[in-house]
Amino acid sequence: MALTLAAAAELLDRHHLLREIIQGDCWTDDAADLAGADEPFTAITYDTRKVVPDTLLCCKGRFKAEYLTDIDTTGLAAYGAETEYSAVTRTPGLIVNDARKAMSLLSAEFYGRPQDELTVIGITGTKGKTTTAYFVQAVLNAYSGGRAALFSSVDNCLDGHTYAESDLTTPESMDAFRMMREAVDNGMRYLVMEVSSQAYKVERVYGLTFDAGAFLNISPDHISAIEHPTFEDYLYCKRQITHNCRTLVLGADCDHADLIRQDAQASNVPVTTFALHAADGHGTHADFVALPDASSGYLFQEQGKAIGDFSLELEGEFNAANAAAAIALSRAVGVPTGSEAFRALEHVHIPGRMEHYESGNMVAYVDYAHNYVSTKTLAEFVTHKYADRNPRVVVVTGSVGDKAVDRREGIIKGAQDYADRIILTAEDTVHERMIDILHEMQGYITNPRVVSDIELDRAKAIEKAVEDAHAHADRLTILLVIGKGEERWIKVDGKHAPYEGDDHVVKRLFGLLND
């Protein structure tokens, strides 16, 4: 059914969000008092530059009245906002208590509630969301014949096979429901999506219930004035997935697991657990377990019974744990234990994740690692993997400006016990000066054996790391180039500036580029 002003008002009122409807001097809570209340909206947007005739405009965030200058000439049908703008527009305004919640509900309704036509899986956690999401999509694609969509921090996929770079870990609600509708129209049956803490903080998934949710792990991240003021707030937002899913997959070793179980119990949500065990019977009890297997890589079990042994293309024990979570989620949405679809786990490749290159005495890993946990995990992995070759480790990294300020110290803490040298370089920033961020990071280095320097040009920083390896040709040097993955841009003063890409720089310097 098409969304009209009357239907929008009724929906918002049902969710206790509607304050009143205002058009000029008419203030009412009954849309029938206004002309055209039953005329359908033909478009919905939160960007005044995209208004066309019969559009419903959602005013969110730091919206300003000046954005509505001359808006009546565009054919705007109505707007939703926490403030009335009768002084600048003659169109009716749906005045609400929470504009972001309202936008999510109205967007879902405008696009015909596409979530009801999909089996939706939501994945949260500090580390592993992207990898787990790709694993689940691969299994569901194999199981359904390519009918699984994906929303991730790396790429979005709306047809099961075409991937486009994403802007946000979890899209704005309006964009999410628009993409869900496109996925449904493309014949998709499943949607796998990462769910960030910000998604709950700013109501991007308000009103959305996941058929299966996952809470992988938790550690401090995204703590800043514009994200989460405290770890408690970060964890609280993450925990909301527990109240908004039909079944929950939980990391058995997750910090605060008891609290998350209490949340699930309060919402009558069944919990399934997963874990990585060092050997059979050695680890926290879990329903789904990944075990090292000398012959194949990892043996995966469900309730103590083998699902199969798989050799994962993605290296590292942490990725085996992510695969166990993916198996648990796939089982939760109906993939049978013996399905050959699980073989798809072996061939998952994620752009910019654990990209591995070798040349002479050099090994390089390009990865999106960007906080304490991901940096430490990667550094620990390569140190152990190449321990018999006594490697030197050179880390090339920076940290984003204007947000997640805790990452600056976290990245250093995660790297310095493994690194011989840390080269600090450019990352994305809006207002903060990058040189100030890098000097701050340098100040967090407490390990006296770590050599550090600053090179603002990111490509030159990687070149310095390669030169360092050449200067120590008698030893293996491992280069960890982290933070940007395969992104072909760096945000400078809030604007995207072209960048060669970490992976491309490494391949160029290693002589691995194809002509």
Identify the residue ranges that each predicted region occupies.
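Short loop/helix-cap segments at secondary-structure boundaries that form the rim of catalytic
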Residues: 51-52, 70-73, 83-92, 157-161, ...
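N-terminal leader/targeting and accessory segments in enzymes
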Residues: 1-105, 109, 315, 504-515
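Short, polar loop motifs at secondary-structure junctions
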Residues: 63, 79-87, 152-155, 253-255, ...
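Acidic, Mg2+-coordinating active-site environments of NTP-dependent enzymes
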Residues: 54, 87-89, 212-364, 442-446
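Buried hydrophobic packing segments
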Residues: 103-107, 136, 140, 183, ...
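Phosphate-binding loop of NTP-binding sites
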Residues: 9, 105-248, 252, 256-270
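ATP-dependent carboxylate-amine ligase
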Residues: 1-19, 51-58, 62-64, 331-337, ...
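Short, conserved loop/helix-junction motifs that constitute active-site signature segments
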Residues: 71-75, 206-209, 241-246, 264-267, ...
